[in-house]
Amino acid sequence: MKANLPTARYEVPRLSEEAGAPVVFTLRALPYGRVQELKRLTEEADIRILLAGCVDPDLKAAALQEKFQGVTPAETIKAMLLPGEIADLSIAVEKLSGYRRTTIEEVKNG
């Protein structure tokens, strides 16, 4: 049985300030196998993870690609976000997927 994958919304303050309105990404956790597959493709892994986990905005939308002059969704991300923002959003997807946080507890002797 496939577990329901958690989602969360993250605002990018720099883009919100430029747009004069909140710019929010809705992200979804990825299953273990998908995260591992994307990490094996080490070149631009952060961008691949963000593309796979971003629910909204639709990074494949022609209007968004046109606005940021990106021919591909990956190019759109690079034009839209700073490198640190890409990394932070990618980390957020990993955290939603159970990575980069403590998901276990130490068993005390006794």
Where are these regions (language model features)?
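Short, surface-exposed, charged amphipathic helix/loop patches that serve as local interaction elements
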Residues: 14-110
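Extended acidic low-complexity intrinsically disordered regions
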Residues: 1-15
